Structures are given as C-alpha cells and as structure tokens.
C-alpha cells in the first residue's frame, strides 16, 4: 500500500535532461540572446579561431551542453551572430534606403539629402554598435573563408544602394560610373572611422566624429550634389561617358 505522502509516478515533475535549459529560460529568448550578445563580443575581439564554445559558455554562466542546446556547433553560432547584427543594421537603415530609392529619379537636393541621411545613419549605427565593425574586420582578414557571410549579410544591403545610384544615373539625375566602388569606399571609410574611435582619447574622439561627418558630406556633395549631373562630374565621369556596371548584385 502506497503511503499517502507519496506522489504518484505520473504526477511527478519530469526531470530536466542534461543540457536542457530550465523552465524559466524556456519561457523566453533571454538565454539565447545573452549567448548571442556575449559570443558577438568575443568573436569581434578574438575572431572565431580565438574563441571557444567553452569561453562563450563561461561568459554566459552556463555549461557547454546548455549552449549546445541553442547552437549545436560554433559555426552555427558564428553565423547567428552575423545574422543578429545584420538584422539590427537593416532595421536601422531600411527606411533610409527606401528614401534614397524614392529620390533616385528626382535627383537634385532630394537625392543629396537622402544620400547624406543614409551615410550618416550608417555611421551612427556603427558608432552605437562598434562590435559590428570588429566582427566584420575579423571576418575580412581571410578574404575567402566565410564569403557566404558576405553574400547573406552584407552584399544585399550594399546592392540596394548601388542599384539606387544606378537608377539615378540611368534617369540622368547623377553621373555615376562606379557605384560598386563608391558604396564600398564609404563602407570601408566608416569602418576605419570606428576603428580610429576605439583607440582615441575622449578629445580625439570628438574631433574624429566631427571631421569624419564633415568629410562624408563633402564626399557626397562632390559626387552627387545639386547640379553635378549637369556639370558632368560625379565619381570620375567625363562628358559623354557611359554608366558602367561590370557586375550587378542580386
């Protein structure tokens, strides 16, 4: 005869298996988000080769088996970190890209304003999320490994801006022969700016922020400011030169 104090087997709580998160952790994405946040910081500082799953688990305060429950391999976690920063970047920049696309056919001051807003929005985003710069710089140290990350999380956004510039050129509102190089020049300059901020003193940071934004405005105004299309200038274009695109981005 079973004692009244005993709990019937079918009413006992199920035991938590090894590596499974606790019930409180299963109720929301907090553990996964903490893993991604800490992993992004470590990958940005050390690169994937210098970061182990054990390092990440220790930063989060869980064991490796619990980390494996969310990400079965380091490659999956590394990819998810890029997906996370890309989602944040797209959320910040998508409205600005849409404004640029609408202004492409108009040209003049609306296009110049949209370009400046997009460039400054990109710089603002990187300053607020510097790990984005260092995550990508670590990736680009090896030009061939991880090219799939570029295709998934960098080239689509670059391509949208390139196509907007190409549409503006085809509409005759700007003269643009090298949108591919123009976009990447701004991207690399912005990442270099964030790198300079990381090593600067407070006073140097203020100067860097001011001068870099001033340079961005001068760069864009020189290429795409009002009247540039009529003047025949813009990204190295000469009178009668055609728009040249060697490879458009899908």
Put a short name on every predicted segment.
Residues 2-18, 124, 128, 158-171, ...:
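C-terminal peripheral helix-coil segments that are non-catalytic and often amphipathic
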Residues 31-34, 38, 42-76, 80:
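Helix-turn-helix
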Residues 71, 138-144:
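Short helix-capping/turn signature of helix-turn-helix
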Residues 83-89, 97:
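Short, basic, alpha-helical segments at the C-terminal edge of helix-turn-helix-like DNA-binding modules
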Residues 90, 94, 113, 128, ...:
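Amphipathic alpha-helical packing segments from all-alpha helical-bundle domains
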